[in-house]
């Protein structure tokens, strides 16, 4: 069993192209008790960030200009730094669920979010990831 403090100290990367979304997600995680949170609005930087920091969880928006979440996951898989992609994808398009899971995401959250669901999915994934 993983201690709760280990889960709240897990490293989390938030990826979204909109500053308001990044700030909201970061605030929710901070308010919940998470302490090691990194954010980026540059999806092209995710692979390099993950290879340097080995995040325990990546909270990834799917719909972003220039490079979408599917492309980010493809780059992460191709880099091979972590065979287990610790990705939860976020999107307003529930029809992308299967495609996202097939691309390597471990979980999927549809917009609009229920905050309790988001917190629970993040906690549960980190609990499994840190075993």
Regions found by a protein language model. Name each.
Residues 64:
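Receiver (REC) domain active-site loop signature in two-component systems and cognate sites
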Residues 16, 61:
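Active-site residues of response regulator receiver
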Residues 113-126:
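C-terminal output helix
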Residues 19-38:
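Two-component/phosphorelay signaling modules centered on CheY-like receiver
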Residues 39-57:
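Acidic, metal-coordinating helix/loop segments flanking the phosphotransfer/catalytic sites
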């Amino acid at each position: 069993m993983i201690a709760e403090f280990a889960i709240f100290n897990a490293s989390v990367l938030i990826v979204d192209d909109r500053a308001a979304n990044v700030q909201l997600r970061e605030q929710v995680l901070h308010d919940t008790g998470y302490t090691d949170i990194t954010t980026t609005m540059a999806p092209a930087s995710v692979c390099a960030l993950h290879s340097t920091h080995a995040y325990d969880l990546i909270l990834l928006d799917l719909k972003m200009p220039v490079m979408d979440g599917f492309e980010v996951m493809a780059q992460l898989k191709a880099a091979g730094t972590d065979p287990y992609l610790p990705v939860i994808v976020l999107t307003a398009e529930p029809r992308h669920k299967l495609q996202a899971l097939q691309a390597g995401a471990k979980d999927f959250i549809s917009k609009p979010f229920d905050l309790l669901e988001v917190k629970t999915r993040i906690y549960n994934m980190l609990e499994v990831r840190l075993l």
